[in-house]
Amino acid sequence: MRVFRSTRRAFLNWTNRLLAGSGLAAGALAADSRQEPEGEDYYEKLGVTKIINAAGTYTALTASIMPASVQAAVARAAKTPVRLAELQTAAGEYIARRLHCEAALVTDGAASALTLGTAACMTRANRTAIHNIPTDLAEIRNEVIVQKSHRYDYDHAIRNCGTRFVEVETMKQYEAAFNERTVMAHFFNAAEGGAIGREEWVRVAHAHGVPCFNDAAADVPPIANLWNYTEMGFDLVTFSGGKGIRGPQNAGLLLGKKELIAAAAMNNNPFSDTVGRGMKVAKEQIVGMVAAVDWFLTQSDAGMEAEFRKRAERIAAQLKGIPTLKSTIALPDVAANAVPHLLIRYDPQRVKITPEAVMQELRRGSPSIELNPTTGKVRGGGLPTDENTIVVGVWMLQAGEEDIVARRLREVLSQAAA
């Protein structure tokens, strides 16, 4: 059963509805040389609705907010030109030292890393192949082995290189899947299900001389995941920059073996005739990613979890007294977004509003609040949810926003219980 694909489809449908209702500001802006100390508020100028993010690190909601130190690093980098290749090399070497891996590359997000890492596996022994993928593949190995339960929407980034997936479900099938066309074995770290675990996946692939790629995009915290998988033997691992690490949204990390990271860089910008030319990473994103790694490594898993639980408990405390309402705090039992979430349940015969309707009410209100899209879903995102569960993602809330979320939830639910 491919639970994740259905979950992702539900999320993508939610994203499409969100975008459809957003509208776009039209018209050219007049030039204005005036500068305010913090810059002009272009959200206000463009008529874009600001939101309170009680959902999580979703791309459609602009992911995370960069900490002050990261914002400052990005702003400072924007003021001075440098040689891009020198910056990428220096940043990669620095990040690799900090994350205990052979090499690293700052990419244009985790999806970009999937494409570049795959291209690296396809072209490392044949540099002319850089110019041939994804169409001229007669002499290029292009089969990627994956567990059937690990197929997901984001593997399109791998198919961008002209690959063909070979799906397996058992160890016997996995052993038999390798041939002269096999170029990579792919593992989706947050997949629900799959008969073959990480260590066995790596062991078998390496026995056949094939590199392993682990997509762990949303899988920090815990902090140690940033080196756990490379130390486990995965040749390539990717993390999103704009999720738990709190870097720029359009940045990511590709970590792994020196040979493969070097090959990934050859398939990347600023080289023109490559599959990664459009995946440009600017100096601001590179510096921001380095600064985010520095910031993230000053945190602790225990400290972050305690803060997130505190926010959830504060919201739950302000919902007491609503008939039949019960609140619990839960962590997903999958690797992605493994942080405390607040789950709210009630008797729909007593509180006469559906979780989806609550989500819409908070979205339409002022300030506009986005709840986690697994609200009203069965086992959403690895959480113990059902059709009658409101899910509040507390980890992207900013100071004081938990009280606003609690107030709006209480207003909507109390009115429905009247």
Language-model-derived ranges and their functions:
Residues 1-7:
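N-terminal secretory signal peptides
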Residues 12-15, 21, 36-52, 56-61, ...:
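Conserved PLP-enzyme active-site core in the AAT-like
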Residues 26-35:
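Bacterial Sec-dependent signal peptides at the C-terminal "C-region" and cleavage site
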Residues 50-60, 71-77, 339-343:
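Generic N-terminal amphipathic, Lys/Arg-enriched alpha-helix
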Residues 60, 73-78, 102-108, 145, ...:
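Short glycine-rich or small-residue beta-strand-to-loop segments that form or flank ligand, phosphate
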Residues 67-109, 120:
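Conserved N-terminal alpha-helix of the aminotransferase class I/II PLP-enzyme fold
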Residues 298-331:
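Conserved PLP-dependent catalytic core of the aminotransferase class-I/II
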Residues 320-413:
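Conserved C-terminal alpha-helix-loop-beta "cap" of PLP-dependent enzymes
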